[in-house]
Amino acid sequence: MSYIRSSIFVLIGASCMILSQSCSTCSRQQTLENIVVDLDLADLAADSVYVNMGREVLYALPNPIKVSMLIKKWGVGFQSALLHDPAKASGYLTKKNMAVNFGIYITDLTTAGLYEQTQTVLRYKQALQQLVEGLGLQAAVDQKMMKQLEDNINNRNEMLRIISETYSSCTAFLQAEDRHLYALAMLSGGWIEGMYIAASTIDQKSENLLKQLIADNKPTFDLLWQALSDLDNVPEDAVILLSQMSDLATLMNVATDNATPEMTAKVKNQILLLRSNFIKE
């Protein structure tokens, strides 16, 4: 990949608009929570026209807050069993696995924070600190930021803002260091974990929600997959990741054009498979 615009790991405008529309019936407070990342939706929508996977790239940041807010809107209570065990953070030894699970853990941290599960938040904060050190991200996430997270543990909106800032700081830092694979692995882990939690939750709701979930999140996935496809000199330990993401891309395309229960079930199963493989030590 010859060039990537610096510091542009941001939400794609289209997904922001989907989020905004999905919460049109929410209370004013919920709407404020949806934009807690403090980004201007109009500016993001304008920036999205610059997407180009050749010489200049605008990455979509699959924001953990988006899917977590959606799940909470469905009226589903906190389900800790769906989250990845933070105690396993020390078991990831390769940079690729650390990056993928950083994305997974920060999504779980977001979910716990949204449901105001303070002790769970602290456990995921500790897991992230281990991965920050393993990935050499101390310059992107300093102790001050981690302390701010802990100090604001009872201030949900501020805590979610700090989490979002941490996520974007880490991916931008990796991008600036020309560690594109790890930045994309982090984004992939976050996207898959959010979809995994949402898809698993849908078992308790309506099959139509699964179709809508896939359709609403396809724009960000398409950009993520295109960026992954554009990687040069992919190391051996990432080949399987790309292959499985390729399978998901194929299924997502078919499910969008032919949203039968069978096809949406295949997409869900591929997401579950990817998540299972991602968390293996």
Task: Name what the model sees in each region.
Residues 18-25:
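C-terminal motif of bacterial Sec signal peptides marking the signal peptidase cleavage site
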Residues 30-145:
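N-terminal Sec/ER secretory leader and immediately downstream segment
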Residues 103, 125, 129, 164-167, ...:
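Generic structural concept
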Residues 150-231:
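Extended amphipathic alpha-helical interaction segments
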Residues 226-281:
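A cross-kingdom marker for long, charged
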Residues 109-116, 135, 139, 174-177, ...:
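Secondary-structure edge/capping motif, primarily at the C-terminal ends of alpha-helices
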Residues 1-10:
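Bacterial N-terminal signal peptides that target proteins for export
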Residues 90-97, 109-116, 120, 148-151, ...:
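Non-transmembrane, amphipathic alpha-helical segments
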